[in-house]
């Protein structure tokens, strides 16, 4: 991964309902010259996010669309950090690597190997935060995903952080 100079990047990761948004927005208020971002900067395309009741029922994109989507994310990250040098901290509520943990959410259809290769060119967070509350807490906040899917995602997040050999808070 690529290191961005002078900007401290915090990537907060976890399943839906783990508290990412709450913590990220709180940090953004407390830190001077900081920027809150959800998943990625919206540089090439408008922010057209919408609440999807069950993201796992969405149909996967084609290889080409998945490749172009990830490439557009990479360009957006690069352009954002090159043109916004006055931020001391960027707090991400999810980070691009979330696509490895839950590719279905992003309708992602690239191999894990190719995805990891491309992700190596993304700016490297200085601090990864993995939020892992118990299943009861998660279910009290979010109801979109069944327990089996949530448990699988928690397992994948845990595996990601262990295998990446990157320092993180849990």
Tell me the role of every PLM-derived stretch:
Residues 1-9:
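Extreme N-terminal, non-catalytic leader segments
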Residues 21:
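Walker A/P-loop
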Residues 17-18:
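ATP-binding Walker
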Residues 94-160:
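A glycine- and Lys/Arg-enriched "phosphate-lid" helix/loop adjacent to the NTP-binding pocket
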């Amino acid at each position: 991964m690529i290191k961005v100079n002078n900007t401290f990047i915090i990537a907060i990761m976890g399943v839906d309902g783990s508290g990412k948004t709450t913590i990220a927005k709180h940090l953004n208020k407390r830190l001077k010259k900081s920027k809150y971002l959800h998943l990625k900067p919206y540089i090439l395309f408008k922010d057209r996010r919408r609440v999807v009741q069950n993201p796992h029922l969405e149909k996967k994109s084609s290889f080409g669309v998945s490749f172009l989507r990830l490439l557009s994310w990479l360009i957006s990250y690069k352009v954002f950090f090159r043109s916004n040098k006055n931020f001391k901290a960027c707090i991400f509520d999810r980070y691009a690597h979330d696509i490895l943990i839950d590719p279905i959410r992003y309708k992602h259809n690239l191999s894990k190997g190719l995805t990891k290769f491309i992700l190596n060119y993304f700016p490297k967070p200085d601090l990864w935060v993995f939020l892992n509350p118990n299943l009861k807490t998660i279910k009290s906040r979010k109801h979109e995903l069944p327990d089996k899917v949530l448990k699988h995602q928690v397992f994948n997040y845990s595996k990601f952080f262990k295998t990446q050999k990157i320092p993180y808070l849990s």
